[in-house]
């Protein structure tokens, strides 16, 4: 099937993530790619709107994922893996302890220092 055919039944929304709840049912698949949690002081850009997407916003998103999960929607969420810089950082492991967390290798080609480019671990969180 052509992508254009599949996309005829897709709704793409732009806004606060909580605004989508009225469109969600058990047949909904949601992929979330929020601003990534900074891994260090030099990678701390997370202000895509007037409010920074900080740890409190990450917690709010986690609670929202729980609501979506209760409805029966399929959820996939990506983010940075804090274990890249601190093996003991359990932030996402604790927030999403009832979900499946996979660590995947991702390439980074943008960095002011050539030595900072290369492979890093990212997380994929799913409820299926």
Region annotations inferred by a language model:
Residues 1-46, 60:
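SAM-dependent nucleic-acid methyltransferase catalytic core
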Residues 11-15, 52-59, 116-119:
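Conserved phosphate-coordination/catalytic loops
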Residues 35, 80, 128:
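Anionic group-transfer/hydrolysis microenvironments
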Residues 37-72:
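SAM-dependent methyltransferase catalytic-core segment centered on the flexible catalytic loop
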Residues 95-128:
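Class I S-adenosyl-L-methionine
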Residues 58-107:
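Conserved Class I SAM-dependent methyltransferase catalytic core
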Residues 27-28, 44-47, 90-92, 117-118:
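Short, glycine/charged-enriched secondary-structure capping and boundary segments
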Residues 21, 38-41, 83-87, 111-112:
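Short catalytic/ligand-binding loop motif for oxyanion handling, primarily in non-cytosolic enzymes
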């Amino acid at each position: 099937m052509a992508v254009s055919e599949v996309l005829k039944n897709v709704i793409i929304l732009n806004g606060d993530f909580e605004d989508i709840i009225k469109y969600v049912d058990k047949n909904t698949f949601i992929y979330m790619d929020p601003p990534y949690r900074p891994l260090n002081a030099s990678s701390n850009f997370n202000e895509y709107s007037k409010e920074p997407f900080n740890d409190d916003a990450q917690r709010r998103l986690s609670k929202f994922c729980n609501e979506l999960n209760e409805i029966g929607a399929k959820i996939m969420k990506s983010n940075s893996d804090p274990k890249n810089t601190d093996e003991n950082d359990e932030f996402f492991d604790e927030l999403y302890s009832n979900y499946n967390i996979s660590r995947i290798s991702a390439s980074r080609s943008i960095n002011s220092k050539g030595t900072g480019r290369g492979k890093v671990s990212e997380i994929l969180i799913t409820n299926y």
